[in-house]
Amino acid sequence: MKIAVIGYSGNVDETPVKQLGEICEELGHKIAIKKHILINGGTDGIMALVSRSARNASGEVIGIVAGLESGNKHLSFEFKTGMDSSMRSVLMMYNVDAIISVGGKAGTGLELFSAYLMGIPIVLLRGTGGWTDRIAGVLIEGKYLDERKLVEIKNSWNVDDAIELAENSKRR
């Protein structure tokens, strides 16, 4: 299964990424030991942390990188898109079976909306801040972004449940 982890970009030693280090380490490690392929934007922040822990557990990590910039050193494979980060995010959604969201700013919000419109299962790892927690407050019936009910957005409060929810979801 190809699982995307989306969330905050930025320096791993600064707020808010630093506070999520343990969660990201656990998430990347457990995705890898379950033999799933980890896909992300391939650069810094949450992406670097989950990539590092997945690679340390001998997992496969694909970075779908914006523009022509270099991805982080923990990627098994780096795909330079030549696209801005918004378009890169949409391209990434076409290549995943499910996403797990950890915190995040506007780019994460874009990825959440794109995944929803494409019928990609979404798991919110709650308590991580940003759009991951913020979007939960606007969900219809606690699980849909709009009346079309394209895909159920699931809430998790720990890494094990987040992965299990992703594994048990089907892309529309």
Which residues does each PLM region occupy?
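Short, amphipathic alpha-helical "lid/cap" segments that border enzyme active or binding sites
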Residues: 25-28, 159-164
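C-terminal binding/interaction regions
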Residues: 7-16, 86-160
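A generic secondary-structure signal marking the coil-to-beta-strand transition
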Residues: 1, 75-77, 152
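Generic N-terminal amphipathic, Lys/Arg-enriched alpha-helix
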Residues: 1-17, 28-34
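Acidic/glycine-enriched connector segments
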Residues: 21, 25, 32-33, 41-114, ...
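Short, hydrophobic alpha-helical segments
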Residues: 166-172
